[in-house]
Design a protein with these regions (language model features):
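Short C-terminal tail/terminal secondary-structure segment
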Residues: 2-11, 238-253
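Conserved glycine-rich cofactor-binding loop
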Residues: 27-28
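Rossmann-fold cofactor-recognition segment
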Residues: 61-76
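Substrate-binding pocket helix/loop in short-chain dehydrogenase/reductase
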Residues: 103-104, 110-116, 205, 209
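Catalytic loop of short-chain dehydrogenase/reductase
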Residues: 115-116, 124-126, 139-177, 188-189
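Conserved Rossmann-fold SDR core element
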Residues: 166, 175-190, 237-244
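A glycine/serine/threonine-rich, flexible loop-to-helix segment
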Residues: 189-212, 253
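C-terminal substrate-recognition "lid" of short-chain dehydrogenase/reductases
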Residues: 217-244, 249
Length: 253
């Protein structure tokens, strides 16, 4: 039997032991990987998602404390979920939407509203509902992207909403202090959503990234989850944006 006190390398107490993590958008991809990582660090997890069947499958897989199926972009549903939380919450992870390719001359008003609400308004309403629920020193972790730093056709509105997130998160960190607020800005992540968007072009995209990225591999959901849990654990981190793109921004063009 290993004596923990005799060899610190042989034993490490889980860093989130006894804590509760809410993952909004926790049924697949980055969300379920974050839940899995949090569980490995000793946390209880509460998962939310739109699709009740996928949510239940994810909950069974990771051993979630509870689930709630609702659309987080609906303020009333989000408020009901928050009011129903009897367990003190330590951390909230919001996975956020995927990219939407909407040319500005073709997008309608409701699509434009959605592009903004899926980023800024979702973060605002999560922050407001977290007040009084998340403990001091706990954290809200939001997902954004690095794509806004390199303009592209069809992404003007989504890029604008994404680009606003770092400033919003920094301000929210001041408004909600001592609750911490941070942002993860991801490049391409090899998720089921990415696969559905790229279809038959997925393998070519993966190969292109493997050969061009400085890290010589594709960023996966587990990589993002590891960063999210690190942000939860390190209680000095707040108001900041953390890029995770494998060096994608360093590639010319």
């Amino acid at each position: 039997m290993i004596n923990p006190s005799s060899d610190s390398r042989a034993y490490r107490e889980p860093s989130l032991l006894g804590q509760t993590v809410v993952v909004i958008g926790g049924s697949a991809g980055i969300g379920i990987e974050t839940a899995r990582r949090a569980r490995a660090e000793g946390a209880d997890v509460i998962l939310t998602a739109r699709d009740a069947n996928r949510l239940q499958n994810a909950a069974t897989e990771v051993g979630a404390l509870r689930t709630a199926a609702f659309d987080a972009n609906d303020p009333a549903s989000l408020e009901r979920f928050s009011l129903d939380l009897s367990t003190p919450i330590d951390h909230v992870m919001v996975t956020g939407p995927g990219p939407r390719y909407w040319p500005v001359m073709e997008i309608d008003f409701e699509q434009a509203r959605l592009a903004i609400s899926e980023h800024i308004l979702l973060a605002l309403w999560v922050g407001r509902n977290a007040a009084g629920k998340v403990r001091p020193g706990g954290t809200l972790v939001f997902m954004g992207g690095t794509g806004a730093r390199r303009p592209a056709r069809g992404l003007a509105l989504v890029s604008a909403a994404t680009a606003a997130m770092p400033a919003f998160v920094a301000g929210l960190a001041l408004d909600l202090a001592p609750v911490r607020v941070n942002l993860i800005a991801a490049g391409f992540v090899d998720t089921p959503l990415s696969a559905s968007l790229l279809g038959d072009d997925l393998d070519a995209r993966r190969e292109q990234l493997r050969t061009s990225l400085p890290i010589r591999r594709v960023v996966g959901p587990a990589d993002v989850a590891a960063l999210a849990v690190h942000i939860m654990i390190n209680e000095t981190l707040t108001g900041a944006t953390y890029d995770i793109d494998g060096g994608q921004q360093l590639i010319p063009g």
